[in-house]
A protein has these predicted regions:
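Conserved lysine of the Walker
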Residues: 422
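Hydrophobic positions on the alpha1 helix immediately C-terminal to the Walker A/P-loop
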Residues: 425
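Post-Walker A helix-loop "phosphate-sensing" segment adjacent to the P-loop in P-loop NTPases
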Residues: 432-442
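P-loop NTPase motor domains
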Residues: 23, 30-49, 56, 60, ...
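A short helix-turn-beta junction within AAA+ P-loop NTPase domains corresponding to the substrate/partner-engaging
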Residues: 458-462, 672-685
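Extended, folded cores of ATP/NTP-driven motor/assembly subunits in large transport
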Residues: 1-378
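Hydrophobic anchor at the beta1->P-loop junction of P-loop NTPases
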Residues: 414
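Conserved P-loop NTPase
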Residues: 700-756
Length: 764
């Protein structure tokens, strides 16, 4: 085994291995499935008769330590350690529910005959490049394995119950005089019994799949791979030269025709109708002719295929049980699992990803029949680093851990009907972000739901209402407000949006009015920009006074419309900011603003968040912003346009916004607002109303099967969209935990919170 991953399997035979990852096939729309299937057929047709290739699917129980390392949350010796440890225990419990201890990996190994390594290397590298490009064509991630990685696969196959991790380096090999086999071999091999074998303290059995079914289905391989046990499935595939394949089939057609003639002669001699011949001959004759037609005119090739299964267990009884389970799946699809009697050693070697088949049992299949063993099922989402918990994969029961920062565009949406668990999902993410990252978190809370959670983490709740003494100034600006030399341009956009909410009717602001506002904005900031001290920060009243001084009639109309917000009963936003916004966790509670001011409040909060994002950018710090009732910002054209613009800008500035809404129709009200979807690589979709389901299916290209996960689904169930990955999820959060009481907004849980002595919003 060379460092570069090229293995000399036998004299004159060399191979390489590529690991590839899953894509969503079982959940895909039929047309997408067909496209994947056709691509897979083209992929198989790439291999000519000089290349032997092997598909390996390995399910093995891994050491849980590596998973526990990903979800481990360390104490930080602060007042939140109790909640931190409670969340960590919840993650461990969820990990135990899933199959994360069972690792499923997929490989393709390809080999060629060559006189020496110098001849083999360029050929193998060319094939490797072609395979990687073919995988890339249908969105499959793949990478070639080096020598140590290939050896590790074999070590883990031979030493399944050994807790000692694989340790190997080529430098050690030179120093010790050992060879690669010494590093991977188990303590012993025993092939005494013809039906099974022993390696170390593991017992195993190798079987082959006898393909009897007249038609195969793409679900068969997927069902084998869903088994919750140690299992290696290997498909050895050898392409037959096209001319040889056609010649072979023609000779079979000739043989069948000869047999027909013999039967017809026999019929004539016996005095009965010469058309009455054995039905099998007619059947075989028709099939052989169709096969010949496929090879000659339908882009089909002929392959020799061997499907080998290696089951392993700790004892004989357990082994017989898993072999019986495997055989049951084969039987379900009208095939048979046959034990390789007295060929267990050859079977074991054929089960290693070496690209060599030592089993003489082969079945001839066309491209389409071979491609029915589609190697794709469903994707998993389990990332390291600062990954956040999003529930369990509804198909595999594995933990879903994802880091939105790794996406090209981390902006996100949480969509769902009332009661589907939208705000709970947002609070769960906020909690997870708070305890494992250093990110700032800002919440716009139109319903007053987030108070208990924010207070539990010593966050700052800024309650904005006509009677409150907490003020934020919509005119606040800082020098970093925009990424060019003119921060006033973006601020002017914001003030235009604000004035549209205040003044604009159905048609919004007139062009003349926009010009007047823009002029006044530039004038009102002159003193502050010349000497940027807090005392010179303008307030709405300064803008109002400037509008009054303008000569145009429209400026008087604008000023009159602003008057109620400056001198009237809605003057809550005519003050300088008097609250510190330096806390890591800030919640703007705007529940008491009333209908008239709520949209305005949300817009002003959004601007305050933008100010925070611009400051944090300089400190290389991420800012997460959660906007509940997000649809309220999208109803007026100018505020929608401003929100879309901010949504686009957030990514570049280290902001990670999350819109939470039940009104999908508002999100798709115009082509411009649709940009929010296009600029959001993360969507958490919970139960959806019938009309919204159809809209989303069209917008996000969701299959009917995928839609079933957001149709009358339970609380905390749905689909997660992470980049190009779509996974059905479920989250059954332990309702006995303190965190659950802090996050839930159900009336019965509010009562439980009160019994635990946790203050609610109205108790503060």
């Amino acid at each position: 085994m060379g460092k570069d991953g090229i293995c000399r399997v036998e004299d004159g035979y060399y191979s390489k291995t590529i690991r590839f990852y899953d894509i969503n096939y079982q959940l895909a729309q039929n047309e997408d499935k067909n496209a994947i299937f056709e691509n897979w057929c083209d992929f198989l047709n790439y291999f000519d008769s000089t290349i032997h290739f092997q598909l390996s699917f390995i399910n093995h129980h891994s050491n849980m330590t590596e998973y526990e390392d990903v979800i481990r949350i360390k104490k930080q010796n602060d007042s939140f350690d109790d909640l931190r440890m409670e969340f960590a225990q919840m993650l461990r419990n969820q990990l135990a529910k899933g199959n994360n201890g069972l690792v499923r990996t997929k490989y393709i190994t390809f080999g060629i005959e060559a006189d020496n390594i110098r001849e083999a290397k360029p050929k193998l590298e060319r094939i490797e490049t072609d395979i990687l490009n073919n995988f890339k064509a249908f969105g499959v991630s793949a990478y070639p394995l080096n020598g140590a990685e290939r050896l590790q696969i074999m070590y883990e196959t031979f030493n399944q119950n050994v807790k000692v991790p694989f340790k190997f380096s080529y430098d050690d090999m030179l120093r010790t005089g050992l060879n690669t086999k010494d590093y991977i071999a188990p303590s012993s091999f025993l092939f005494k019994n013809g039906k099974d074998f022993q390696m170390g303290d593991t017992i195993g059995a190798v079987s082959y799949l006898q393909i009897l079914a007249p038609e195969l289905t793409d679900k068969m391989l997927a069902e084998f791979l869903e088994m919750d046990c140690n299992l290696l499935v290997n498909l050895h595939i050898q392409s037959i030269d096209q001319m040889k394949a056609i010649k072979l089939v023609k000779s079979k057609v000739t043989d069948i025709n000869r047999m027909k003639i013999e039967e017809q002669k026999k019929a004539v001699r016996s005095g009965y109708d010469m058309d009455i011949i054995p039905s099998d001959l007619n059947t075989y004759g028709g099939e052989a002719k169709r096969l010949l037609e496929d090879l000659q005119s339908r882009n089909e090739r002929m392959f020799l295929v061997t499907v080998v299964f290696l089951n392993t267990a700790k004892n004989k009884q357990e082994l017989e049980n898993v072999v019986f389970q495997t055989a049951g799946i084969a039987q379900k699809y009208n095939c048979a699992l046959k034990r390789l009697d007295y060929q267990q050693e050859q079977g074991l070697m054929s089960s290693l990803p070496l690209g060599r088949n030592w089993i003489p049992i082969k079945r001839a299949l066309t491209t389409t029949s071979t491609a029915i063993f589609v190697p794709f099922t469903t994707q998993e989402l389990f990332m390291g680093g600062e990954s956040i918990y999003y529930g369990l994969n509804a198909l595999s029961n594995n933990l879903i851990m994802a880091d939105r920062k790794k996406l090209k565009n981390p902006n996100g949406l949480i969509l769902g009907t009332p009661g589907s668990g939208k705000s709970f999902a947002a609070k769960r993410e906020i909690t997870n972000v708070f305890i494992i990252t250093k990110d700032d978190i800002i919440i716009c809370d139109p319903e007053g739901e987030y108070f208990p959670l924010v207070r539990a983490f010593n966050g700052q709740v800024i309650r904005i209402s006509p009677t409150s003494h907490d003020y934020i100034n919509p005119m606040d600006i800082n020098i970093n407000y925009a990424d060019d030399d003119d921060p006033l341009s973006l601020k002017s956009d914001f003030i235009l949006s604000l004035c549209e909410l205040v003044v604009g009717g159905k048609n919004g602001l007139e062009p003349v009015e926009k010009t007047i506002i823009d002029r006044c904005v530039r004038l009102v900031y002159q003193d502050y920009l010349a000497d940027p001290i807090p005392e010179k920060m303008p307030i709405l009243e300064d803008l109002y006074n400037l509008l009054r001084k303008q000569e145009e009639a429209e400026s008087q109309r604008l000023a009159t419309a602003l008057e109620i917000y400056v001198n009237g009963s809605l003057k809550v936003f005519n003050h300088r900011t008097n609250v510190e916004l330096n806390n890591r966790l800030v919640c703007f509670d705007i529940k008491d603003l009333g209908k008239q001011l709520k949209k305005l409040g949300m817009l002003i909060v959004q601007d305050q968040v933008w100010n925070r994002v611009t400051v944090n950018r300089s400190a290389h710090k991420s800012t997460r912003y959660y906007i509940d009732e997000f649809h309220l910002l999208l109803k007026e054209e100018q505020t929608a346009a401003y929100s879309v613009e901010i949504w686009k800008r957030f990514r570049k500035w280290g902001g990670i916004p999350t819109g939470i809404t039940q009104n999908v129709k508002d999100l798709l009200a115009s082509r411009e607002i649709e940009n929010i979807f296009e600029n959001s690589d993360f969507i958490l979709m919970l139960n959806q109303a019938s009309g919204d389901r159809q809209i989303l299916a069209k917008q996000l290209n969701i299959s009917t099967h995928q839609l079933s996960y957001v149709t009358n689904s339970g609380e905390g169930e749905g689909l997660i969209f992470y980049g190009n990955t779509i996974i059905p999820f479920k989250d059954r959060f332990d309702n006995t935990l303190m965190l659950y009481a802090l996050m839930s907004s159900k009336p019965e849980d509010v009562e439980k919170r009160e019994k635990l002595g946790i203050k609610g919003r109205d108790d503060s």
